[in-house]
Curated annotation (Swiss-Prot):
The gene is algA. This is Alginate biosynthesis protein AlgA. NCBIfam families: GMP_PMI. SUPFAM superfamilies: Nucleotide-diphospho-sugar transferases, RmlC-like cupins. Produces a precursor for alginate polymerization. The alginate layer provides a protective barrier against host immune defenses and antibiotics. The lineage of its organism: Bacteria, Pseudomonadati, Pseudomonadota, Gammaproteobacteria, Pseudomonadales. Monomer. It comes from the Bacteria. Belongs to the mannose-6-phosphate isomerase type 2 family. Its cofactor is Co(2+). One of its GO terms (molecular function) is mannose-1-phosphate guanylyltransferase (GTP) activity. It catalyses: D-mannose 6-phosphate = D-fructose 6-phosphate; alpha-D-mannose 1-phosphate + GTP + H(+) = GDP-alpha-D-mannose + diphosphate. GO terms for biological process: alginic acid biosynthetic process; GDP-mannose biosynthetic process.
């Protein structure tokens, strides 16, 4: 059995803590380790192969770093240039396995879910394996114990041909209003759709080809044109851009006659909103969850998350307060489903706070935006030992670098020289330059940018050891590409 970890997401539902370039699976929300790390760690047991991770190519270095931090392994990373939902991601993985002669069971799991009961998960997997070995397509359903409006539902029915404890999927139901959700819980036989699946690779491809041939055909061509190594699959941007955007549920599971459901009673949560995160965290005697430097007075059932500043609250009930360095979000706990719409509104306004935190992680290290004005920006840059930035040029800004600690190797046009603590240099506009850390300790510098445009997209790369490049134009038809 091969786990396939889907590590996509737009970072919108737990904004401002999650961002597009650092979505929630890479955050430590329910303990010391991140949701991504917890997902992989719960799959380390006998009979389970090392996983395949599917992620956005901009996240691949975060994935590698979080794997290394916990000494975790994955057999391959499949990198998408942009999201096309779950059906193409799983199809490409299944095709890759079948092409390699490994037509095995695929356990498809989101990277950002919480499962508290490991033994219950393994029992559900054992039952699901029996069904999947018979050619069934298994969906793990969480028994609906309360009228939850944030989940999709599955209506099940008995089928004597299935193993005991497994039921046939009768109907998929979109996220209901509260009245319908109450009816579902009262009537019984309804499950929350966990988004977790088990099926054989060839079975999924057979059903996908039957029910959504456009996705199937585009994925075949995408994989043929992708760059594959022993460790990674880098999808062809132009071909993948033509792939329809669809989920496993819509593309296959709602149409196939082989969909069945296995109950999963394992303390599952998709941590899909701030109310869900409040529910899975430890609380004080008044039902409050607090993180960071927080002082709570005369308040009940609140979620207060501080990230640097002192946050004090008085007389609040069922309120969520989330503070980060560059944004604050305050909402009633019953209204947190609206955070996604708020992020959409901010995106329409061109707000950068939805994309990145002030501290941004790169394969070579990180940078933190310290201050910004009309024609200047100040950054604190940290470069890992032995790492280097790309050989690059900016068309609209100059840069001043001041070394705070460590040693910097600077390339500026034809000149290459070293800087040590308290030394500085100037990088003129349109100069070809690079920063490298040749030392054994992190390199810390202060960068002062000045110019008419300071966006991160003002960059022309000439050499980059991490293989970063500008995305290709999208929207060309797959028929055109195939010619």
């Amino acid at each position: 059995m091969i786990p396939v970890i889907l590590s996509g997401g737009s970072g919108s539902r737990l904004w401002p803590l999650s961002r597009k370039q650092f979505p929630k699976q890479f955050l430590a929300l329910t303990g010391e380790h991140t949701l991504f790390q917890q997902t992989l760690e719960r799959l380390v047991f006998e009979g389970m192969d090392t996983p395949i991770v599917v992620c956005n190519k901009d996240h691949r270095f975060i994935v590698n770093e979080q794997l290394a931090n916990r000494k975790l392994e994955c057999q391959r990373i499949l990198m998408e240039p942009f999201g096309r939902n779950t059906a193409p991601a799983v199809a490409l993985t299944a095709m890759m396995l079948v092409n390699e002669g490994r037509d095995e069971l695929m356990l498809v799991l989101p990277a950002d879910h919480v499962i508290d009961d490991q033994k219950a998960l393994q029992r559900a997997l054992a039952l699901a394996t029996v069904a999947a070995e018979r050619g069934e397509m298994v969906l793990f359903g969480v028994p609906a114990t309360r009228p939850e409006t944030g989940y999709g539902y599955i209506k099940s029915t008995n089928d004597s041909l299935l193993p005991e404890g497994v039921s046939r999927v009768q109907q998929f139901v979109e996220k209901p209003d509260e009245k319908r959700a109450v009816e579902f819980v009262k009537s019984g036989g309804y499950f929350w759709n966990s988004g977790m699946f088990l099926f054989r690779a060839s079975r999924f491809l057979e059903e996908l080809k039957k029910h959504d041939p456009d996705i199937y055909d585009t994925c075949v061509l995408t994989l043929e044109r992708s760059e594959q190594t022993a460790d990674t699959v880098t999808l062809d941007d132009a071909t993948f851009a033509c792939c329809p955007d669809n989920s496993i549920d819509y593309a296959v599971m709602e149409k196939t006659q082989r969909a069945c459901v296995v109950p999963l009673s394992a303390g599952w949560s998709d941590v899909g909103c701030w109310a869900s995160l409040w529910a899975v965290n430890d609380k004080d005697i008044h039902g409050n969850v607090s993180k960071g430097d927080v002082v709570i007075q005369d308040s009940r059932n609140c979620m207060i998350h501080g990230n640097g500043k002192l946050v004090s609250v008085i007389g609040l009930d069922n309120i969520v307060v989330v503070e980060t360095k560059d944004a604050m979000m305050i909402a009633h706990k019953d209204k947190v489903q609206g955070v996604k719409q708020m992020v959409s509104t901010l995106n329409d306004q061109g707000r950068s706070e939805t994309q990145n935190h002030c501290e941004v992680y790169r394969p070579w290290g990180s940078y933190d935006s310290v201050d910004m004005g009309g024609r200047f920006q100040v950054k604190h840059i940290s470069v890992k030992p032995g790492a280097c930035l790309s050989l690059q040029m900016h068309h609209h800004r100059a840069e001043h670098w001041i070394v705070v600690s460590g040693t910097a190797e600077v390339t500026c046009d034809e000149n290459v020289f070293l800087l040590t603590e308290n030394q500085s240099t100037y990088i003129p506009i349109a100069s070809v330059h690079r920063l490298r850390n040749p030392g054994k300790i992190p390199l810390e510098i202060i960068e002062v940018q000045s110019g008419s445009y300071l966006g991160e997209d003002d960059i022309e790369r000439f050499e980059d050891i991490y293989g970063r490049s500008t995305p290709v134009e999208r929207g060309v038809s797959v028929k055109t590409i195939a010619q």
